[in-house]
Amino acid sequence: MVLDLDLFRVDKGGDPALIRETQEKRFKDPGLVDQLVKADSEWRRCRFRADNLNKLKNLCSKTIGEKMKKKEPVGDDESVPENVLSFDDLTADALANLKVSQIKKVRLLIDEAILKCDAERIKLEAERFENLREIGNLLHPSVPISNDEDVDNKVERIWGDCTVRKKYSHVDLVVMVDGFEGEKGAVVAGSRGYFLKGVLVFLEQALIQYALRTLGSRGYIPIYTPFFMRKEVMQEVAQLSQFDEELYKVIGKGSEKSDDNSYDEKYLIATSEQPIAALHRDEWLRPEDLPIKYAGLSTCFRQEVGSHGRDTRGIFRVHQFEKIEQFVYSSPHDNKSWEMFEEMITTAEEFYQSLGIPYHIVNIVSGSLNHAASKKLDLEAWFPGSGAFRELVSCSNCTDYQARRLRIRYGQTKKMMDKVEFVHMLNATMCATTRTICAILENYQTEKGITVPEKLKEFMPPGLQELIPFVKPAPIEQEPSKKQKKQHEGSKKKAAARDATLENRLQNMEVTDA
């Protein structure tokens, strides 16, 4: 995931100042741009020198061949004139005045210089890439410039009644319909582990079927992705911070052979976007085949580092969940990817409108965008039981930022003298099932249970097509008694502590009096 290096090269029509401005608008270090430009300039000089040295080496070989053909004496003198050692002034005429033995010595010295130059070039290339991969994509002009998404995310539009309030939050409702085992899930799987069961399993499957059917009717190809990816491929689709904060690493045998003791490092996917992005890695995509639209279905795995204390109960923010994703490869020409961007967010909106979930669309501030996104719109649903908007959908246009690292090119082959173009890649959530379930539970709650949304009824089993009944009391209504019990126990402990302190004081007084 990187920008085009030519954007940093003034002589290639690039504008480093524009990229510095983008970094500043993203509230990231603009100094990375200067470091990259410096490393790239040195790299280009080094490559130019290496090219010249290789030409000189070839010239040496050619001159030796000509002298041998003329049967000139080889000679045994390996001393080389000072003016030849600089290589910069080395010409065919200068070589012609040397013996074969001297030219061989020059060629050997050139080989050493090439090795030294190559080592320096590799070092500079690594330095350049380290900076390049931490510089974000160019921003779309409509992105709000701010580093505070809580205040400055721009609301683009609202659908439905986002003021209504209801009694219970999803944390209580998943228990009331007996569709969730949280404590046992945590014992088995650790923090945020859970079992989804009973009616909520059917509701999740209904959402998956409805989402896939909706996308299928719009020309999307359903695709069920691998759950893990090789490290070298994941490095091409994920930014560096994700390896520390989001991705789970899996270590396994390198092959199925029993005598193979090698180990392979892989990463569990955080979204089907990652494997689908790599699906056409190293390919040329024909213009007439675009756009290619995929409806990705996968289980997703996320560490959620940095979210400690947030949404610790229920199923809204968990380490493992199912998700249907929109992913599109688009033409880089004629604003096609931005037209597709609007189409994808519209598809998501119409899906949630059909489910009767109120929401607003927010334009995410520059400081909260990941490196790849040129622009991101979120669909945040209204949760009437929680009294808050919660994110259900993220829609991003990454332009050619991802495709460049994955080498997914636009066109059939590289034409002579033409610059290679890369496809644009876009992604948008269609349905993260656990979050959508939470939104449905809060919006469709009644006194007796959860009314099943009209569009999901045909996918639910008999007896659950109209109403999902409450079968357990709300945990929040049991909590006061628990709190009172804890308060009572706390009062007893405090009283015991006071008594112990008083007794100690009395004993001290007795000792003093004595």
Curated annotation (Swiss-Prot):
Region (Disordered): 472-514
Alphabetized CDD domains for the sequence: SerRS_core (cd00770)
Name recorded for this polypeptide: Serine--tRNA ligase, cytoplasmic
Gene3D superfamilies in the record: Bira Bifunctional Protein, Domain 2, Serine-tRNA synthetase, tRNA binding domain
Record-stated family: Belongs to the class-II aminoacyl-tRNA synthetase family. Type-1 seryl-tRNA synthetase subfamily.
Positions that bind L-serine: T271, R302, E325, N427
Residue span of region Interaction with tRNA: 9-61
One GO term describing the cellular component: cytosol
GO biological process, one term: negative regulation of vascular endothelial growth factor production
Pfam families: Seryl_tRNA_N, tRNA-synt_2b
Residues the entry annotates as binding ATP: R302, Q303, E304, V318, H319, Q320, F321, E391, L392, V393, S394
Compositionally biased tracts (Polar residues): 504-514
UniProt superkingdom: Eukaryota
Modified positions (Phosphoserine) in chain numbering: S241
Catalytically driven reaction(s): tRNA(Ser) + L-serine + ATP = L-seryl-tRNA(Ser) + AMP + diphosphate + H(+); tRNA(Sec) + L-serine + ATP = L-seryl-tRNA(Sec) + AMP + diphosphate + H(+)
Modification sites for N6-acetyllysine: K323
Metabolic or biological pathway, per its Swiss-Prot or TrEMBL entry: Aminoacyl-tRNA biosynthesis; selenocysteinyl-tRNA(Sec) biosynthesis; L-seryl-tRNA(Sec) from L-serine and tRNA(Sec): step 1/1
UniProt site positions, description: Important for serine binding: T429
Enzyme class: ligase
Function: Catalyzes the attachment of serine to tRNA(Ser) in a two-step reaction: serine is first activated by ATP to form Ser-AMP and then transferred to the acceptor end of tRNA(Ser). Is probably also able to aminoacylate tRNA(Sec) with serine, to form the misacylated tRNA L-seryl-tRNA(Sec), which will be further converted into selenocysteinyl-tRNA(Sec). In the nucleus, binds to the VEGFA core promoter and prevents MYC binding and transcriptional activation by MYC. Recruits SIRT2 to the VEGFA promoter, promoting deacetylation of histone H4 at 'Lys-16' (H4K16).
Organism whose genome encodes this protein: Pongo abelii (Sumatran orangutan)
Broad class of the protein's primary localization: cytoplasm
Alphabetically ordered keywords of this record: Acetylation, Aminoacyl-tRNA synthetase, ATP-binding, Cytoplasm, DNA-binding, Ligase, Nucleotide-binding, Nucleus, Phosphoprotein, Protein biosynthesis
